[in-house]
Regions:
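Active-site/ligand-binding neighborhood in enzyme catalytic cores
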Residues: 96-98, 105-234
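N-terminal Rossmann-like FAD-binding beta1-loop-alpha1 element of flavoenzymes
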Residues: 6-34
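Dinucleotide-binding Rossmann-like beta1-alpha1 core, especially the glycine-rich loop
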Residues: 53-129
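Long, positively charged, glycine-interspersed low-complexity recognition regions
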Residues: 6, 17, 216-218, 235-240
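Glycine-rich FAD pyrophosphate-binding loop
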Residues: 25-51
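Conserved beta-strand segments of alpha/beta enzyme cores
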Residues: 31, 56, 81, 216-218
């Protein structure tokens, strides 16, 4: 491979690397080489079709696109359309189902109350004051100091143990700075104006981004193997973990 013809080398063909390559190729009209260690483009957003069911799925877990920036939304829609999906989450506790993140409906249903939006703040304050935690030492202390013991035990403790595989009392308080509590009935997980999942899948986005006469990309290529052959005149942009 002749690296001397490329002004830019981008390591990683995920969102950051692919967008940057597309921008350099179109805005600067300069040659870009994109390399990817995996056998596919798209990074952790890679999607593929299951041959048995013919259903497209996200190999590394579901990714929901969301933004409130019009410029970003207009840009990404050059490469795909979206299905309008808005993420909503439900949590089960003691055979009852509640909306998450915690909102006014969650609080009223859980405590059997009929609070109005302007009353939520004082109610949570009263729950927090029952524990009198002024200097949180652990994640558990911090969470209880934010939402009170009952909401913590019902909706945060179990999920935290599952996520970290540790008792929340053994985790530092610094892990969380705040817990989202909505003082209204908004049940959407994200606040952003534009949300959805690409109608043709994420992989199609990256194919279109990298389909440019100034862009060349190679899969199954390890940066550290080719590093000694890269000329100093080439700008290297490393976008991998």
């Amino acid at each position: 491979m002749d690296f001397s013809i490329f002004r830019y080398l981008i390591v990683g063909a995920g969102f950051f690397g692919s967008v940057l390559a597309e921008r350099i190729a179109n805005d600067r009209d300069e040659p870009v080489l994109v390399i990817e260690k995996r056998d596919h483009i798209g990074g952790n957003c890679y999607s593929q079709v299951d041959p048995e069911t013919e259903i497209e799925y996200h190999r590394y877990g579901t990714h929901i696109f969301h933004t409130s920036k019009q410029k970003v939304w207009e840009y990404i829609n050059r490469f795909t359309s979206f299905n309008g999906y808005r993420h909503q989450v439900l949590a089960s506790y003691q055979n009852r189902v509640y909306q998450m993140p915690i909102n006014l409906e969650t609080i009223n249903s859980f405590f059997g109350l009929n609070l109005r939006p302007f009353e939520v703040g004082d109610f949570l304050k009263s729950e927090v004051e029952k524990e009198n935690i002024t200097n949180p030492k652990s994640l558990e202390d911090k969470a209880v100091s934010l939402v009170g013991r009952k909401l913590y035990e019902a909706f945060i403790k179990g999920y935290t143990i599952k996520q970290w595989q540790k008792d929340p009392r053994e985790l530092p308080a610094s892990i969380i700075q705040r817990l989202p509590v909505r003082k209204n009935y908004d049940e959407n997980y994200y606040f952003d104006q534009w949300q959805g999942i690409p109608s043709s899948g994420y992989s199609e986005i990256f194919k279109k981004m990298l389909n440019h006469r100034k862009i060349e990309f190679h899969l199954k290529t390890d940066f550290f193997v080719i590093k000694p052959y890269i000329p100093k005149s080439c700008h290297v942009i490393y976008s991998c973990c």
